[in-house]
């Protein structure tokens, strides 16, 4: 079964694919960017895709929040992957030779203190494993990549330093894309987008509909609507399945305080 992800072989997103679906029957299919993952699922090229949505250090992956608004897809699962960044070079490069670091912006941010300590320049790229591929194919001197040990092994590159992240407790949460969300399990989570009316107390009252039904919100994120200045869409995760009566009632109740609502999906709770 083909599953789309963003990045090259050895990327953390590929690890998330294997962790969620297992390694025996899955065929990870790499995409250049996140939009391509959504598009591949939308068109039926693949049945599912896996995208990162938040990191425990650097926070939200905003582009994917925006893509959930654009695409009419569902979330059918979530998975957390522990990131263990290593510093990777061509075999002939020594540590003292390094001047520039290639990696995805999120990984660069997660290793910010280590990079600044050594006064290295940074070169943001589209992917962690892709950075390893770039410095190998171009045989870049004085250059290292931040990626996984798996990426170093896949491209036969040298690991020159380990434990380089600012915080060893470094996890990324991934969501699994589909055309349908998951059936209730009794321990679920639902993701929802809504835009509160521009009136006093609208957001407060909308969120109160969950509290009054004893529904726990596990995350709330705001993003600009990009259509009206200073107007925001709110992305919320809450415990429960959308088919549960208390959840259905809460979703219906917030509509009187919102200009629109969109259920992204209900899925088994992992985090």
Which stretches of residues belong to each language-model region?
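Domain-level signature for soluble enzymes in the chorismate/prephenate branch of the shikimate pathway
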Residues: 1-271
């Amino acid at each position: 079964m083909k599953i789309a992800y963003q990045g090259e072989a050895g990327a953390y997103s590929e690890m998330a694919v294997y962790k969620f679906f297992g390694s025996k029957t899955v065929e990870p299919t790499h995409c250049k960017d996140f939009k391509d993952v959504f598009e591949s699922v939308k068109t039926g090229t693949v049945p599912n895709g896996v995208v990162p949505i938040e990191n425990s250090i650097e926070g939200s992956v905003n582009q994917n929040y925006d893509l959930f608004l654009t695409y009419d897809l569902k979330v059918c699962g979530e998975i957390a992957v522990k990131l263990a960044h290593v510093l990777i070079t061509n075999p002939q490069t020594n540590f003292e030779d390094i001047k520039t670091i290639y990696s995805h912006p999120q990984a660069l941010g997660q290793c910010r203190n280590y990079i600044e300590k050594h006064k290295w320049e940074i070169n943001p790229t589209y992917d962690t494993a892709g950075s390893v591929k770039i410095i190998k194919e171009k045989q870049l001197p004085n250059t290292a990549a931040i990626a996984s040990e798996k990426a170093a092994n896949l491209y036969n590159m040298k690991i020159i330093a380990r434990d380089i992240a600012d915080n060893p407790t470094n996890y990324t949460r991934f969501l699994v894309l589909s055309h349908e969300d998951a059936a209730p399990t009794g321990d679920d989570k639902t993701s929802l987008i809504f835009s509160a009316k521009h009136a006093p107390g609208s957001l407060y009252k909308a969120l109160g509909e969950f509290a009054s039904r004893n529904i726990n919100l596990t995350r709330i994120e705001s993003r600009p609507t990009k259509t009206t200045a200073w107007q925001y869409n709110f992305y919320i995760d809450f415990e429960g399945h959308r088919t549960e009566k208390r959840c259905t009632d809460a979703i219906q109740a917030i509509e009187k305080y919102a200009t629109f609502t969109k259920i992204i999906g209900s899925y088994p709770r992992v985090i």
